[in-house]
From Swiss-Prot:
It comes from Streptococcus pyogenes serotype M4 (strain MGAS10750). Belongs to the elongation factor P family. Disulfide bonds: none annotated. This is Elongation factor P. It holds the Pfam family EFP. GO terms for molecular function: translation elongation factor activity. The gene is efp. It is found in: Cytoplasm.
């Protein structure tokens, strides 16, 4: 059992017959009354997200999640296809369940598939990835790192804020936890 006050982003637990992943969690102390936990959660099976609050002392059954190394193969219609790199088993995951993760991976990228029992529930991407800039405003001569930056669309469709000197076609290192530019590759 785990208390609501100990839940952090990325953890998975069971509540009301649902398998739920924490996307965001924060303590909130209203002016009057007891502390509450505000959380943004995702139902792992359906992919739907919702906001809720819990008392810090509420307890939940923590889900035991196993991970296996895998490779992203391709996406067709509403399904993403992955292959276990140890056993070569292939897995189909609804795009709604891995929509955010697909913004950070290309075909043949290495990932980790998450299992709850024998059920595939999600994908973990590396902490940083290398992606190419597909489209951005032209760079400004004399631009420095200290500028406010500009939006750039990457090859996966992800939009990140980058320094003014970045041009289309350049490879960038992206932090997948925050969805931010780290450096040029």
């Amino acid at each position: 059992m785990i208390e609501a006050s100990k839940l952090k982003a990325g953890m998975t637990f069971e509540a009301e017959g649902k398998l739920i992943r924490v996307l965001e969690a924060s303590h909130h102390k209203p002016g009057k009354g007891n502390t509450i936990m505000r959380m943004k959660l995702r139902d792992v099976r359906t992919g739907s997200t919702f906001d809720t609050t819990y008392r810090p002392d509420e307890t939940f059954e923590q889900a035991i999640i196993e991970t296996v190394p895998a490779q992203y193969l391709y996406k067709m219609d509403d399904t993403a296809y992955f292959m276990n790199t140890d056993t070569y088993d292939q897995y189909e995951i609804p795009v709604a369940n891995v929509e955010q993760e697909l913004l950070y991976i290309l075909e043949n990228s290495d990932v980790k598939i998450q299992f709850y029992g024998s059920e595939v529930i999600g994908v973990t991407v590396p902490t940083t990835v290398e992606l190419t800039v597909a489209e951005t405003q032209p760079s400004i001569k004399g631009a420095t790192v200290t500028g406010s930056g500009k939006p750039a669309t990457l090859e996966t469709g992800l939009v990140v804020n980058v320094p003014d000197f970045i041009e289309a076609g350049q490879k960038l290192i992206i932090n997948t936890a925050e969805g931010t530019y780290v450096s040029r590759a």
